[in-house]
Amino acid sequence: LANGRQIEFSDKNLGSVFNNQGLKIGENKSSTLYCYPIHSSLKEKNTLLVPIAGEYRLVLADGTKIYANSGSKIRYPDVFAENERVVELEGEAYFDVAKNPARPFIVKTTQSEIKVTGTKFNITSYPDDGFEQVTLEEGSVQVKRKGEVFKLTPGRQYFLDKKSEEIVLADVDPILFTSWKDGLFRFQNMDMLNLSKKISRWYDIRFDFKDERSKKLRFSGAFDRKSSLDEFVKIMESTTDVRFKLDGNTVFISQTER
């Protein structure tokens, strides 16, 4: 929290309400945090850290809902400024922004600045990923990077390659990038390297590729995020040319020999 206090949310304090010098933070049984400002002049910033293998929903003082994926960090104020609403994201989050044309909602990442007034969209911006992407489900979004502004309409995606700094705008099916918040992994022609990063954040495991070919193999499919790691491995081995070997918290991956 802004005053240096740390609160660890768990099953032990479900339903608790914490008073943070003018801000009440409550958690319900669906792992949703609610922020209730007591003093409208308080503009300190708090940080929500979502652990690996975890996820949280956050309802801000203005009514905006944020679904934060595992391994993510979100900084947000107790109370927004009068002319804008600014939060900072590192990781992945889905935003359902409360409409307020007079106070645009701005998400800052290490790469870009995403500006909306009221809409639904997903941002993926993990430090260890080689890309950043913004996927719009509803409304409109402006992505600003190094002086350039990119406007998105529903079903469009902004994709930044961090290494080459190439930016691609494309038509996509938003559900492929937002279904995680509803408890479902969806992949469409995704290479094993990027797929392994998503899986490792959820199951808190490490992937070790035995050869470069395995990293480039692609997978399309869906499975429940509540599935065990063993169930995930069975699904992957039955539908791909990949062999998985689990040793402790490390999964060794190699291509099946034909």
What are these regions (language model features)?
Residues 1-258:
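A residue-level detector for the "anchor" residue at the start of short, highly conserved motifs
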